[in-house]
Curated annotation (Swiss-Prot):
<feature type="binding site">
    <location>
        <position position="342"/>
    </location>
    <ligand>
        <name>Zn(2+)</name>
    </ligand>
</feature>
<dbReference type="InterPro" id="IPR027417">
    <property type="entry name" value="P-loop_NTPase"/>
</dbReference>
<dbReference type="GO" id="GO:0046872">
    <property type="term" value="F:metal ion binding"/>
</dbReference>
<dbReference type="Pfam" id="PF22524">
    <property type="entry name" value="Nlrc4-like_WHD"/>
</dbReference>
<keyword id="KW-0862">Zinc</keyword>
<keyword id="KW-0547">Nucleotide-binding</keyword>
<feature type="domain" description="NACHT">
    <location>
        <begin position="464"/>
        <end position="759"/>
    </location>
</feature>
<feature type="repeat" description="BIR 3">
    <location>
        <begin position="278"/>
        <end position="345"/>
    </location>
</feature>
<keyword id="KW-0067">ATP-binding</keyword>
<feature type="binding site">
    <location>
        <position position="335"/>
    </location>
    <ligand>
        <name>Zn(2+)</name>
    </ligand>
</feature>
<dbReference type="InterPro" id="IPR040535">
    <property type="entry name" value="NLRC4_HD"/>
</dbReference>
<keyword id="KW-0479">Metal-binding</keyword>
<dbReference type="GO" id="GO:0043027">
    <property type="term" value="F:cysteine-type endopeptidase inhibitor activity involved in apoptotic process"/>
</dbReference>
<dbReference type="Pfam" id="PF05729">
    <property type="entry name" value="NACHT"/>
</dbReference>
<keyword id="KW-0677">Repeat</keyword>
<keyword id="KW-0053">Apoptosis</keyword>
<dbReference type="InterPro" id="IPR053882">
    <property type="entry name" value="Nlrc4-like_WHD"/>
</dbReference>
């Protein structure tokens, strides 16, 4: 290490790019690019952070404390990181070494933090084992005193002499002043930061900044004569009372401890491993191959335990594995050779010379062994012996000491340490759970304040009567056993103060048993014995040095008298008791508790810790699990307790496929299997409990209830006092008048509800079936099925029975047609709070519905079909469900990927029922959407002058573009991480050869693509060959058609439609298109070129029915169409848009030869031959849609033929000018004859303005009208006609557009708002104005608007640009929006995007 306080600033890389490339390939993600970007960001953060030796984080316990707010979804546990020298910085997820300042932001499943630390900073002095002041998490301040101070005791009576001893005081302890220490009577011993009182001999170490030497002296050695000479008894008492933890504990309790010190275990990094104990390591070699040439004893001494596979052994400390042992191999030498930095080896080496000395020092004191001075104030006072004890007292002392020895032997045996789990979890090793720190909070009985505690803090605060409460399987037993093991192993100095520790299971005792009998039976075994008198004497004499760990507490009434008294009258005995109790059993013991500890949910990093150790031979399956949960954050909480982890370990052991296809439902199945094995003797009782709890879960789920009271339980038939219930539900009583019950998790509630629903639907009782149908029918919309109840239905399918499945399938497949439910979709807020990720899913689905109802329908249909098929196949009822499935498929459009479903392999003929299949091919060629030109509208517009309170009505385009660019960048990054996948044609129908049936119609959507690669071409060739008809929709994909020429040439007779937008067609591509003989529809729009070769030869498409050309600003389109085009008599749609002058005579000839024309759109700027055009149109009796724009229109000529179009559904004359009143009146009268009209965009002009009221009245006679638009013609009188004429009229109106009507005054708007009513289907209302015509309105008008909006129940879009609204106005409008039936969908557009900032008036 450099000088203390300095650190290397070299750039470091935490990423294993070789492994990352492997991971990218495995999961189809480009993680390397993402990692490089993240690494650069981390480096910038690293450069900002403070470096240098951090003496405040020398303590491992303090480092551990910094992780309280750490993200639990990580691969490293806080214990591993703190032991490796790291503390949480609070900057993102960054951790930093207290010694070398190494900063890490990432975790690694394959590399532990200590390994990552060694790789990146091998020179770190902490790692090298040098004295940098590290304080182990279980270490204590009290140290064993030196036999003789340097220079003799007498010389240190003077403070200056004591001060001189601190000449080599270590750098890391400078936070504690040598002057203050010497003043408090301490002398530096020269070892680490250990000091010793010259008077009483008390020795203390582990000094940290802020420590008060006088306080420490008073706490640990209150009888010191020097201390008493300097401080009054009151001051000493205050010091002791204000000390945190260690109540009633002094230094004497630690120094006189009977616990053997396991010296090689001083390292903080390995003192949690139970395999630090040689006997436990030895026990793991029971199945060691007999033919192995290496002795088990040598392997054990070298720190190894057997993994159970081949001849592979693993070091308990460094985790290193060795195998393939040969004759003559020395395990210790090989350990040193391959893993020289192993902490166990280093500690073993450094302790080799010290062990004999310390072992004799720590030997149990005997009256005849003392050689110390008899001075009362000397060190001998601390090491007092039993020389003054009477004979009877000496007897209890010897028996107690012997008992302590027997207890320690018991707690370090495998039979004690191994988890007592039934056979479902029997393979879970001892080391995997005892090494995990549970998450604990402390709740002081007399105070509502709760606080998180680390395990060292718990151990420091053990006193009086305490309980540790938690769910069934939360780790209470493990926690108590861990305390007993750590005490017995000598690895935990914090527990040295206890001379006797009794772990007693209360589930196997009877009320008439004596305490001595219980201890003998449970802990001492055959031959073990302790007298009641001796036990009583030991408890009375040792008091606070006795710790009872009472497991499986169920109530005071069932306890033997001795234990009952210890709990209820602890003030008489002053022993320490820690009682493990289920959460719902705490109430009757609470009056006797000082502190209650509560075990929280099992952190996910503990799950990873266990699985990483248990499946170290197959780490890939653990990686898959982590990725699964990273993609499904809502499911991370399923590992609520260690018991769930044990269940999945068992499932993975028994079912290898579960490792590759992990699903949360298998976890719950494994957990229920565990319960069935645990309670197989009472199977009927278990079934009844699961059934009643399932009923409660089901009722709660459908009423959005996730908390229950006693009445709810009683109504569902749940017995809250039955122990089985505690494995399914939790009881919460803290700070509540009545207890509240919850299931082990929201997902577990859904799982039990699913079990119950299947039970009901499968029942032979009609009442049960009816109840099941009642619940099933509450899932009455597709959105509920694929969102709020998606997980629930998935769980139901995993239990599906042959009787229930057809009922569920029929119901699900009928939901897609529930249109009314779709229009009233709203999320379940209570459910969303529990499943925040589901809320994002809901937002996506709702957004899809708003943007593209057609895509939403296809998406929902596919999802429901997949779910229905899961039910059918899981229950083996495909034949019974097929009629429902076939009916569902008829006439429907679905995604191509559904053909991978097994059903289309089994029933390929069902393919013929579909209307079409869609496939999308998306590339990375971004089309810029931010280059729109604002010049057309804004170039001659002056910035508006407005009051400051209205400036929020305008947003500068640069800000808008900046936000859009950020979104675009996010999209690019996402696409780089997730490469575009090829259409999947690997399963189901695609495995049939030959294909018995073809896809009726294939719709191919290609977006932002360049030329296709060979892999995509191969896929398209196979898909095209399996299609009867193919339709192309290409957007921003120049060069794509040429690249798939081989596929098109093989299937050219199948291509019926080609729609192309924003792309350039090469000459080769135009020639390729001309070879498609079956083309019926051709669309070309928004291109920068005129594909003249294609257009010159349009007549070669003999089956062409639709031609759509939208090329604003390009050369005259009509001029390049061939004369032979008129021979295409089947034309049904002709849409021409060009902004140049056109010769309409050719167009007239075309129309005259198109008798089947249904749709006609025209935009151009030439007026000649208009009358002949209208005459030609009049002959088209089948026209359903007419749109005119540009300058090609003569009003009277068109009005004269308008009554001929009795089948007309859409008439768009937006922007056409009707100047005279006579023509306008005739137009209004003609409208009355268009009884089938659905959409009307009214023309403009003075004439139309004069007859606007008449037009409104005529529209009232149009029963099918859905869209109505008036621009620039309405005034106060005419607009009120619309409002006043709504009684019984406009019932189907969905879109009312009255924007840009600047003749309407504020009063006119107000009257209109007050009158508008009874439009039940109106979804869009547009009242926008242009910027010069902006309007500033009074509060009464805003109020009228709000009342109007509240009377339009289907409104989802309100446009009101140029309405100047202040903060108060928007508050009123937003309040109405929140209360509106469509509040989740209603969007209000009121803000202009402009290339200027408004002028603010003073």
């Amino acid at each position: 290490m450099a000088e203390h306080g300095e650190s290397s600033e070299d750039r470091i890389s935490e990423i294993d790019y070789e492994f990352l490339a492997e991971l990218s390939a495995r999961f189809g993600m480009n993680l390397v690019q993402l990692a490089k970007s993240q690494e650069e960001e981390d480096h910038k953060e690293r450069m900002k952070m403070k470096k240098g030796f951090n003496s405040q984080m020398r303590s491992e316990a303090k480092r551990l404390k910094t992780f309280e707010s750490y993200d639990t979804f990580r691969s490293w546990t806080p214990q591993e990181m703190a032991a490796a020298g790291f503390y949480h910085t609070g900057v993102k997820l960054g951790v930093q070494c207290f010694c070398c300042s190494l900063i890490l932001f990432g975790n690694s499943l394959r590399k532990l933090p200590i390994e990552r630390h060694k790789k990146l900073r091998p020179e770190c002095e902490f790692l090298q084992g040098k004295d940098v002041g590290n304080i182990g998490k279980y270490d204590i301040r009290v140290k064993s005193p030196e036999k003789m101070l340097r220079g003799g005791k007498a010389r240190y009576h003077e403070e200056e002499a004591r001060l001189e001893s601190f000449e080599d005081w270590p750098f890391y302890a400078h936070g504690t002043s040598p002057r203050v220490l010497s003043a408090a009577g301490f002398v530096f011993t020269g070892k680490r930061d250990t000091v010793q009182c010259f008077s009483c001999g008390g020795s203390l170490g582990n000094w940290e900044e802020g420590d008060d030497p006088w306080k420490e002296h008073a706490k640990w050695f209150p009888k010191c004569e020097f201390l008493q000479s300097k401080k009054s008894s009151e001051e000493i008492a205050q010091y002791i009372q204000g000390y945190e933890g260690f109540v009633h504990v002094t230094g004497e309790h630690f120094v006189k401890s009977w616990v053997r010190r396991e010296l090689p275990m001083v390292s903080a990094y390995c003192n949690d491993s139970v395999f630090a104990n040689e006997e436990l390591r030895m026990d793991m070699f029971k199945d060691w191959p007999q033919e192995s040439p290496v002795g088990v004893e040598a392997l054990v001494r070298a720190g190894f335990f057997y993994t159970g596979k081949k001849d592979i052994v693993r070091c308990f400390s460094c985790g290193g594995c060795l195998e393939k042992w040969a004759e003559g191999d020395d395990p210790m030498e090989d350990h040193i050779k391959f893993f020289p930095e192993c902490v166990f080896l280093q500690t073993l080496k450094s302790s080799a010379e010290v062990i004999p000395t310390l072992q004799s020092q720590y030997a149990l004191p005997e009256a005849t062994e003392t050689t110390r001075e008899s001075n009362h104030g000397d060190a001998a006072a601390v090491h007092s012996t039993v020389v003054d004890l009477g004979r009877s007292e000496a007897q209890w002392f010897q028996e107690a000491r012997s008992l302590s020895e027997q207890l320690r032997d018991t707690y370090t045996k495998t039979s004690f340490c191994h988890m007592n789990l039934p056979e479902v979890c029997s393979s879970l090793g001892t080391d995997h759970l005892l090494s995990c720190d549970v998450s604990i909070i402390s709740k002081h009985i007399s105070q509502p304040v709760q606080g998180a505690l680390t395990i060292p803090e718990v151990f420091s605060n053990l006193s009086s009567v305490m309980c540790v409460e938690g769910e069934a399987g939360s780790g209470k037993t493990t926690f108590l056993k861990r305390i007993a093991f750590l005490w017995a192993s000598g690895c935990c100095p914090l527990l040295y103060r206890f001379q006797l520790v009794f772990y007693l299971s209360l589930s196997s005792i009877t009320p008439d048993q004596g305490l001595d009998n219980i201890i003998c039976t449970q802990l001492l075994g055959a031959g073990g014995c302790i007298s009641e008198v001796c036990l009583s004497s030991s408890i009375q004499q040792l008091q606070h040095q006795v710790l009872f760990l009472l497991d499986d507490y169920s109530g005071l009434a069932s306890l033997p008298q001795a234990l009952h008294t210890l709990i209820t009258k602890n003030y008489l005995f002053r022993t320490c008791l820690l009682i493990a109790v289920h959460t719902n059993r705490v109430r009757d013991i609470r009056p006797y508790l000082g502190t209650s500890l509560e075990i929280q949910e099992f952190p996910f990093y503990n799950t990873v810790f266990v699985l990483r150790k248990f499946f170290s031979h197959d780490i890939i399956c653990v990686e898959k699990l982590i990725i699964y949960f990273s993609e499904n954050k809502d499911l991370q909480g399923v590992y609520k307790t260690p018991l769930f982890v044990a269940a999945v370990c068992n499932d993975w052991n028994q079912n290898a496929s579960a490792q590759d296809d992990f699903q949360d439902v298998t976890l719950f199945h494994s957990y229920m299997q565990y319960l069935s094995l645990k309670y197989k003797a009472t199977a009927e009782s278990l079934q009844a409990t699961v059934s009643s709890c399932g009923q409660l879960a089901l009722t709660g789920l459908f009423s959005s209830c996730f908390e229950f009271n006693s009445d709810d339980l009683a109504e569902a038939g749940v017995d809250e006092d039955v122990k089985l219930t505690t494995f399914l539900m939790s009881k919460f009583t803290a700070q509540r008048l009545r207890p509240v019950y919850r299931f082990l998790g929201p997902l577990f509630q859904e799982f039990l509800a699913a079990v119950r629903l299947t039970e009901l639907l499968s029942s032979d009782r009609q009442e049960d079936q009816d109840l099941g149908l009642y619940y099933l029918r509450q899932i009455d919309s597709p959105l509920k099925a694929i969102n709020s109840f998606n997980i629930f239905l998935y769980y139901v399918s995993s239990h599906s029975s042959s009787k229930a499945a057809p009922t569920v399938v029929s119901h699900l497949l009928q939901l897609v047609d529930e249109k009314e439910s779709l229009e009233n979709m709203s999320e379940n807020e209570d459910y969303m709070k529990l499943h925040p990720q589901t809320f994002l899913w809901f937002q996506f689905v709702r957004g899809l519905w708003l943007v593209s109802p057609e895509s939403f329908s296809s998406f929902v249909s596919e999802h429901l079909l997949r779910l229905a098929l899961i039910f059918a196949y899981e229950s083996n009822t495909v034949a019974e469900c097929s009629p429902f499935i076939l009916q569902f498929l008829r006439g429907r459009t679905l995604a191509l990927r559904v053909l991978n479903l097994e059903y289309f392999w089994d029933h390929p003929e069902s393919l013929l029922l579909l209307r079409s299949l869609k496939v999308s091919i998306n590339g990375n060629k971004m089309s810029s959407y931010v280059d729109y030109s604002f010049k057309t509208y804004f170039e001659n517009l002056q910035p508006p002058a407005i009051n400051e309170e209205y400036t929020s009505a305008f947003e500068h385009v640069s800000e808008w573009r900046r936000n859009f660019a950020q979104d675009e960048e996010i999209i690019k990054n996402y696409e780089n991480i997730w490469p575009r996948a090829l259409p999947d044609i690997s399963e189901g129908y695609w495995n049939l050869s030959p294909k018995p049936c073809k896809i009726p119609k294939l719709e191919v959507q290609v977006n932002n693509m360049g030329p296709a690669d060979q892999a995509l071409l191969q896929v398209l060739m196979e898909v095209f060959s399996a299609s009867q008809s193919i339709e192309f929709h290409l957007f921003n994909s120049s060069g794509f058609l040429e690249s798939i020429r081989p596929a098109l040439e093989l299937s050219k007779a199948s291509v019926t439609k080609c729609s192309m937008s924003r792309l350039e067609l090469s000459r080769a591509e135009q020639e390729l298109l001309l070879t498609l003989p079956a083309l019926q529809s051709l669309e070309v729009s928004e291109t920068n070129q005129l594909p003249d070769q294609l257009f010159h030869n349009l007549h070669k498409f003999l089956g062409l029915k639709e031609l759509c050309v939208r090329l604003d600003g390009k050369p005259d389109v009509l001029s390049v169409l061939p004369e032979e085009f008129l021979n295409l008599h089947h034309m049904e749609k002709l849409s021409i848009r060009t902004s140049t002058e056109s010769d309409l005579s050719k167009l007239v000839k075309f129309i005259q030869n198109f008798p089947n024309l249904h749709v006609f759109h025209l935009k151009c700027d030439f007026l000649s031959n208009c009358e002949s055009l209208m005459t030609a149109l009049a002959s088209c009796k089948k026209l359903r849609e007419i749109e005119f724009s540009g300058q090609c229109f003569e009003a009277m000529t068109f009005v004269n033929i308008l009554p001929n179009f009795v089948s007309l559904k859409i008439l768009s004359l937006k922007g056409q000018q009707f100047a005279d009143k006579e023509t306008s009146e005739k137009f209004a009268q003609a409208l009355g004859s268009l009884r089938n009209l659905e959409e009307l965009l009214v023309p403009t002009g003075d004439g139309i303005h004069q007859v606007a009221k008449l037009i409104v009245r005529q529209c009232l006679q149009l029963p099918c009208l859905r869209v109505l638009a008036f621009h620039d013609i309405l005034d106060d009188e005419s607009v009120i006609e619309i409002g006043a004429a709504t009684s019984g009229s406009f019932q189907k109106l969905e879109n009312l557009d009255i924007s840009m009507n600047h003749k309407i005054t504020e009063e006119g708007y107000r009257n209109f708002f007050q009158a508008l009513d009874n439009l039940p289907n109106l979804q869009m209302l547009n009242i926008c104005r242009n910027i010069p015509g902006r309007i500033q309105v009074q509060a009464t008008t805003v109020k009228a608007l709000c009342h109007c909006v509240s009377r339009l129940p289907s409104l989802t879009r309100l446009g009101m640009l140029s309405w100047l609204l202040d903060e108060e106005d928007m508050k009123v409008i937003n309040d109405v929006k929140e209360r509106h039936p469509q509040s989740k969908r209603l969007t209000i557009f009121w803000k202009w995007i402009v290339p200027f900032s408004p002028v603010v008036l003073e």
